[in-house]
């Protein structure tokens, strides 16, 4: 088990940079990627979740600023989901899960995210005018995403984007902007819940990864906004996530 105050191994540093670069280039914080790569190393589950949320806040803040500056942010596509997701993320972070249960929820969430990235066509959205909000769907969706975010250390943006686009509530770029803001606020709420519940872990290992994630997010956001193909990158990320989950499950059942 890696010590909380030890320097991260170089492979982990490289993977963290790659996750920040790839995810930020398509408008996501990278929480699922950080969780996936850290689960490959001997790191405690509390440290994994706390570090992923911290990296999420950094990377998603950059993505949100870029989308907001480009005029794609619509507040009405963010605050309704926060009504239930904020307290749910706090509660999820506050509750301590047994390692086996945590890993089970984590692998299921990562597999879902991998499938979403691999098969979801973001450009296939309704061409008609935006539909009116379905408040029950928004409140329940925010609640479930918030709980999952707090439990495992995800920001939840990967779940929110399809919900907005497929329901015709906004365009893909508006969904990306709202998701980035959602990730930042949700991750902060989840971190606060972990601190209050005694489930927060942070040391030299985490602190070393923060500037690495920041550098990857800055470069990825800039290249993604100007040059890179979002669809291709999303599919590559989906394949990587699913392979990581498969590898982790094989190792988990071997122990």
PLM regions and their residue ranges:
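Helix-loop boundary and gating motifs at the non-cytosolic
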Residues: 31-32, 157
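Short hydrophobic/aromatic, small-residue-rich stretches within specific transmembrane helices
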Residues: 52-56, 179-183, 206-210
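Juxtamembrane transmembrane-helix boundary motif
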Residues: 1-24, 33-41, 45, 65-148, ...
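Membrane-interface alpha-helices at helix entry/exit sites of multi-pass transporters
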Residues: 43-54, 76-77, 169-180
């Amino acid at each position: 088990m890696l010590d909380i105050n030890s320097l991260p191994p170089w492979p982990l540093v490289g993977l963290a940079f790659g996750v920040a670069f790839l995810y930020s280039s398509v408008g996501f914080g990278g929480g699922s990627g950080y969780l996936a790569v850290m689960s490959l190393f001997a790191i405690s589950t509390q440290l994994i979740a706390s570090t992923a949320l911290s990296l999420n806040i950094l990377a998603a803040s950059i993505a949100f600023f870029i989308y907001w500056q480009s005029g794609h942010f619509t507040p009405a596509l963010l605050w309704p989901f926060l009504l239930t997701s904020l307290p749910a993320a706090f509660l999820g972070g506050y509750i301590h899960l047994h390692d086996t249960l945590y890993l089970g929820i984590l692998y299921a969430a990562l597999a879902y995210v991998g499938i979403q990235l691999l098969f979801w066509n973001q450009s296939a959205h309704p061409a008609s005018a935006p539909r009116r909000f379905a408040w029950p769907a928004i409140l329940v969706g925010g609640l479930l995403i918030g709980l999952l975010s707090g439990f495992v250390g995800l920001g939840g943006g990967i779940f929110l984007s399809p919900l907005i686009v497929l329901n015709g509530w906004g365009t893909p770029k508006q969904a990306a902007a709202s998701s980035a803001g959602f990730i930042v606020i949700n991750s902060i709420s989840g971190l606060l819940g972990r601190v209050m519940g005694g489930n927060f872990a942070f040391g030299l290992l985490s602190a070393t990864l923060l500037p690495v994630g920041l550098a990857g997010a800055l470069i990825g956001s800039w290249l993604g906004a100007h040059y890179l193909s979002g669809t291709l990158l999303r599919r590559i990320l989906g394949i990587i996530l699913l392979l990581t989950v498969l590898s982790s499950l094989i190792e988990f059942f071997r122990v």
